[in-house]
Regions:
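Conserved C-terminal structural/oligomerization subdomain of aldehyde/semialdehyde dehydrogenase
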Residues: 1-223
């Protein structure tokens, strides 16, 4: 079982059967997946690169989340947070704008004729929320499709939790939680310490398919 190895950088697969291809894409846990392609290697601008599990913990290089990883949020003390004065029209407009964060999505990326490149976001499934605000964070994580649970747990007990994809803890306890998780075997579990954690609860996957290898592609006739 490839997924059981906990390594998931790249995976190549050849098949002319579309149903089989879709089944593999939906089940394999790797960062970059190549279908019917004669080489396994990411192309800048088409396939953001990075793995899952023991093959990587950060955002994909060349992906939309890459620069965010080098930034740190600077929160103001609560006493300095002064709400702006808005007119009723401004309030109405603010309530009706599109949200900045969308639910799991698939984005088509550019590539040569005869090649499909998709960037896929999917939720991390098993998420523990600890510390102050944990109940609120769990509810927010559930909206993304995560199986999130708010718990009060001794940090040393985290090593006993067998399946875990992420821990949310905004507060001083996060450092101890990170140390405890480092003693676990298997994939590195990220500790999310920023209140704007939604994007970090999403897994990234790049899927590249050579559409010409399946016996023809009608889309090529119009290109």
């Amino acid at each position: 079982d490839i997924n059981a190895s906990n390594y998931g950088l790249t995976f190549g697969f050849h098949s002319r059967i579309d149903d089989r291809v879709q089944r593999v894409v939906s089940k394999i846990d790797v960062g970059n997946l190549y279908i019917n392609r004669n080489q396994i290697g990411a192309v800048v601008g088409s396939q953001p690169f990075g793995g899952n599990g023991l093959s990587g913990t950060g955002p994909k290089a060349g992906g939309p989340r890459y620069l965010q990883r080098f930034a740190m949020q600077n929160l103001l003390p609560l006493g300095q947070l002064v709400p702006p004065r808005l007119t009723l029209k401004e309030v109405s407009n603010a309530l009706n704008i599109n949200p900045k964060f969308q639910l799991p999505a698939t984005v088509d990326l550019p590539g040569p004729t005869g090649e499909s490149n998709r960037y896929i976001l999917s939720p991390r499934r098993r998420v523990l929320c600890m510390g102050p605000g944990s109940k609120e964070y769990a509810e927010r994580a559930k909206l993304l499709g995560c199986n999130a649970v708010a718990v009060t747990l001794c940090t040393n007990a985290l090593i006993l939790v067998e399946e875990l994809d992420a821990v949310i803890c905004v507060g001083p306890a996060a450092t101890e939680i990170r140390k405890a998780l480092s003693a676990r075997n298997g994939p590195i579990v990220p500790v999310l310490m920023d209140e704007n954690f939604e994007m970090w609860l999403m897994r990234e996957q790049s899927v590249c398919i050579d559409t010409t290898a399946a016996g023809g592609n009608a889309a090529l006739l119009a290109s």
